[in-house]
């Protein structure tokens, strides 16, 4: 009982990137700029899709919701990370606050990954079954797929968060990270975590491999269908749309796999923190850039909106 009470009252601190205040301030400015850029880019996509009736199609519906997910995803960790940078690692987070941050980060990140599968399915139907596209991709199905992505993210996040915070935490209160990531928090537990690490690895493998396999299968059929398109313009348009999605998938799944599927023996906290910067800050910036720069309809809608202002 005493151990449980100690754990409940614990506070965690995040290890600074550098002991030099000037370096910390520089990283703070970089993180803040990346965060604001991510917010601006993703909010722009969501608003452009909403106000432009020509973009009210399933593909852009999913793209807009992906942008909204990215906003909440980065916002679940950035404010605390920025406060920690300013305080040189002296900003505490309670165990409840850490668990809450982990839950929302995994929930939104999981929903993000599932939504990428949904977007691949949408493109598969659009390219391989164009005549039946409107019949298959009804608005009711689109909403169901979106809600399903959120539900799966929730069902992934809740048991993982409970699994990790069921562990006892003792004297070591410094998290070698800039947010409450699962492997980093688990390293602070004063108990045997082999079962927990194995469970996390198995769940991560299933959660990452199944969606990635479904996306890969979809794109095998899509590539075959694109090669059959006689029009060079049609092939180029299909290729441009699909290549944008593939780039986003590679960024998201590549970074996540490195963090959660690396063997414990070869896991480097420092490298894990660097890679985490890529998929928590850089990927949400690149997503709107990749989609907007490679999508003619979205670029045209953005130009029209800018001309109005």
UniProtKB/Swiss-Prot annotation:
The principal location of this protein is membrane
What the entry lists under PROSITE patterns is as follows:
G_PROTEIN_RECEP_F1_2
Q: Which domain of life is it from?
A: Eukaryota
Among the GO molecular function terms of this UniProt record, one is: G protein-coupled receptor activity
Give me the segments passing through the membrane. 26-46, 55-75, 101-121, 141-161, 199-218, 239-259, 273-293
Spell out which residues lie on the membrane's Extracellular side. Answer: 1-25, 76-100, 162-198, 260-272
The protein's matches in InterPro entries, at most eight in alphabetical order, are given as: GPCR_Rhodpsn, GPCR_Rhodpsn_7TM, Olfact_rcpt
Q: Which residues lie on this side of the membrane: Cytoplasmic?
A: 47-54, 122-140, 219-238, 294-309
Sorted keywords for this record are: Cell membrane, Disulfide bond, G-protein coupled receptor, Glycoprotein, Membrane, Olfaction, Receptor, Sensory transduction, Transducer, Transmembrane, Transmembrane helix
Q: Where in the cell is it found?
A: Cell membrane
Record Pfam families: 7tm_4
The protein's job, in short, is:
Odorant receptor.
The protein in question is named Olfactory receptor 10V1
**What gene codes for this chain?**
OR10V1
